[in-house]
Amino acid sequence: MNRYAISTPEGTRDRLFSACSVLRKTERIITSVLKKRGFGEVITPSIEYYDVFLQADSSLEQEKMLKCTDRGGRILVLRPDSTTPIARIASTKIDAEELPLRLYYSQNVFRSDISGAGRRTEIMQVGAELLGADGCMADLDILSTAFEAMDACNLDIYRIELGHAGIYKALISSLGVSAAVAEQIRLCIESKNFAALGDILEAYREQEAYEALKAMPQLFGGGEVLEEALSLTRDPSVTAAIQYLKTIYQALCEAGFGEHIMIDLGLAYEMEYYTGIMFRGY
């Protein structure tokens, strides 16, 4: 028998019995939290026009998208991200007076692993989007939803890391490097590759942003990390982002979530649409 007839494509897998049960149970728990908090479900097509992601501020490398063509020769992609299609829905199907809008999704995304690191090509995502609202209250709304979802999963020990996209963006902008070099720096910060980051930044030692960028992978821990970060820069955009993150952190601590929070200023995601608070849990 041809080996392609008995195996799955690279980055995919079959799920059987107990694995399916755990996956569906977790999905039900999280979506029930989202429904309780007033989020309504949307489902976007698994196949989208390539242009949707080419024109959006996603910065997702085109090599990571799984492509095909339709009968007219137009390029299609398997959905690599859920936020961008939801933004398309908001701009084409939702009236401005309906905002703010609370939407959630539970669907798979597909990304080719060009790094060769063995990452999954097909990834299930459950997420929430709060459209037409911003500021501290909106961020705290989404973050408290995340904490509630983690608690609902009966996790005794978990952490949610907090960062701010504006810190890296402001520092890299002041450095004045090409997009290719900026991406190398971002990858080093995100992976906490201190040695490689130091090698790249050596050419920019005289720049004001040098010390802060070099320190970013090490700036994780409790609230003291924010004070350390403030001592490394005088850039008003960076200090404003740090102060905002400090406000969010203090509010979450006052709400009783402090033991589950870790500050990580090395969070630097590839998606350009991240502009403010970022977080991830584990």
Predicted regions and their residues:
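Positively charged, Gly/Ser-enriched RNA/tRNA-binding surfaces
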Residues: 19-37, 48-49, 68, 72-73, ...
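Glycine-rich loop at the start of a catalytic domain that most often binds anionic cofactors/ligands
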Residues: 52-65
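Short, surface-exposed recognition loops or helix-turn segments adjacent to catalytic cores
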Residues: 157-167, 185, 262-268
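Acidic, His- and aromatic-enriched active-site or binding-groove loops in soluble protein domains
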Residues: 64-71, 176-206, 257
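Short glycine/threonine-rich loop-to-helix capping motif typified by GTGT followed
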Residues: 169-179, 272-279
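Short, conserved phosphate-binding/catalytic loop or strand-edge motifs used
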Residues: 120-126, 162-170
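Auxiliary tRNA-acceptor-end handling modules of aminoacyl-tRNA synthetases
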Residues: 1-20
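A short beta-strand-loop structural module common to alpha/beta enzyme folds
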Residues: 40-46
